[in-house]
Amino acid sequence: MEQNPQSQLKLLVTRGKEQGYLTYAEVNDHLPEDIVDSDQIEDIIQMINDMGIQVMEEAPDADDLMLAENTADEDAAEAAAQVLSSVESEIGRTTDPVRMYMREMGTVELLTREGEIDIAKRIEDGINQVQCSVAEYPEAITYLLEQYDRVEAEEARLSDLITGFVDPNAEEDLAPTATHVGSELSQEDLDDDEDEDEEDGDDDSADDDNSIDPELAREKFAELRAQYVVTRDTIKAKGRSHATAQEEILKLSEVFKQFRLVPKQFDYLVNSMRVMMDRVRTQERLIMKLCVEQCKMPKKNFITLFTGNETSDTWFNAAIAMNKPWSEKLHDVSEEVHRALQKLQQIEEETGLTIEQVKDINRRMSIGEAKARRAKKEMVEANLRLVISIAKKYTNRGLQFLDLIQEGNIGLMKAVDKFEYRRGYKFSTYATWWIRQAITRSIADQARTIRIPVHMIETINKLNRISRQMLQEMGREPTPEELAERMLMPEDKIRKVLKIAKEPISMETPIGDDEDSHLGDFIEDTTLELPLDSATTESLRAATHDVLAGLTAREAKVLRMRFGIDMNTDYTLEEVGKQFDVTRERIRQIEAKALRKLRHPSRSEVLRSFLDD
């Protein structure tokens, strides 16, 4: 008999309280059928953990379980005392976001090397579970092989498809000596003058110590293709549920697990499965709405009949044959229900999977995602202090401290995604470089009002460093010529870099002790005429009018038209002649006579003072 979701969850919690723990397999078996979203599964696991029930990969030993039971009350009391003391000491003291963030961050314990490996394994297990689920979706393997064919045809890059391969036979090498050396190197570099950070790792391939071997990739993809063909043929011949087919599917999953896909490609495959599941949900909800809400068919009866017969109309015919009050109403929605069933059949044909198998694959994929996401969250929260310690060294660079922390956290999350515990280094040694890269990149992109490209930032940092060295050597600031000689660069490029390196300054910057005037008040407006020039022009205009007033009206008008005084333009002799209906020669004579009058000392003296020396 089908149990409702509440009773299934209650049974799961009861079992967990009896055992003191739950495994992921038990959670998967007891989850309701309609819960397939990774966020929902993660919320349920979080709720179970909050109840004091640990969710583990596998059942613990009896001795470990007894020890955990004996110390549970003591641990709870100690944890409660720590929380109470921290609350009493901090309550009412501050609402500063940074302090509140640090206070909450301080409640998370630091990880040991073994703890880091344990979390990294959980992340890997979660991702492997997702990949194994995706491997059962034929279209996913087909897509991956098609993308590799594009790589072989030189239409795409191999690095855009995979980041490497996981060796299933590789042993864990803790390499304690290498860990200490790496830690010392990273700390030593962090203590250096931060101006020398020339954007460590310009691209996002800071962890790609070795490029992907094309021959190895060709061999791995050939193995994947061969196993895919065998699996596909076996399923066609014997059916997916046959033991041989299941064995071949398992082999295909093991081969597919060895591929470390680029996040973009991995997300595409996962999303394609999720889109397929959304299509199934849409049709199932439509059918349930028609039968349960519209025809008033009891939900319990619908679930009993529909589950397991998603693409067959036998359940619908059986429901009509039950001769219940709602059975007659089903005839009215028969056409719409059959249309939805046809769409579900179409999904089965597209995927080569039954609806039940699509749900099962999506369910296991969601649990794997939730498991990996939870482990990543633990790793990030345990290393937030590292981000703070690095961000402190980049203050006063143009970004607020909280912004630096957030950018560093983004780098930390990227480091968690790319961390490989098998290389033997501590996570903090590896994450340092991702955090520094994220912070320095954000400063280069956001700190300045006018963004400067990263390569130019590097040149400016190098110029500043050499400039300081030369200042110490010579006791004075070096000239552009000296900098050009030392840096082996053209002098004009040095001057250009020096000009670009200048920081913008606000027009509202106060000037003087009283701060009643601003920098903008002292900047010349080149678009307007100077007050002196404006006054001179106005005086010249008035003097010209006075002088022309001493001439006859005809002479004054001829001069105004010839020289464009108080007019938009000047006129030729021909144009002026037409205005007065006389010849151009006569206009020339009138103009000459008027100018002779103006040259008289009594009139010219007024205008002579405006001539430039």
UniProtKB/Swiss-Prot annotation:
State the CDD domains in the record: Sigma70_r4
Q: Does the keyword Protein biosynthesis apply?
A: no
Q: Where is this site: Interaction with anti-sigma factors?
A: 562
Per UniProt, subcellular location reads as: Cytoplasm
Superkingdom of source = Bacteria
A biological process from GO? regulation of DNA-templated transcription initiation
Region Sigma-70 factor domain-1: list its residue ranges.
Answer: 2-80
Q: Where is this region: Interaction with anti-sigma factors?
A: 584-599
Locus of motif Interaction with polymerase core subunit RpoC: 403-406
Q: What does this protein do?
A: Sigma factors are initiation factors that promote the attachment of RNA polymerase to specific initiation sites and are then released. This sigma factor is the primary sigma factor during exponential growth. Preferentially transcribes genes associated with fast growth, such as ribosomal operons, other protein-synthesis related genes, rRNA- and tRNA-encoding genes and prfB.
The cross-references to PANTHER family, in alphabetical order and at most eight, read: RNA POLYMERASE SIGMA FACTOR RPO, RNA POLYMERASE SIGMA FACTOR RPOD
As for family, the record states:
Belongs to the sigma-70 factor family. RpoD/SigA subfamily.
Q: What free text does the record give on domains?
A: Contains 4 domains, connected by flexible linkers. In the active conformation, the domains are in an extended conformation, each making extensive interactions with the RNA polymerase catalytic core. In the autoinhibited state, sigma-70 factor domain-1 packs closely together with sigma-70 factor domains-2 and -4, contrary to the extended conformation that is seen when the protein is part of the RNA polymerase holoenzyme.
Q: What is this protein called?
A: RNA polymerase sigma factor RpoD
Q: Which organism is it from?
A: Escherichia coli (strain K12)
Q: Which gene encodes it?
A: rpoD
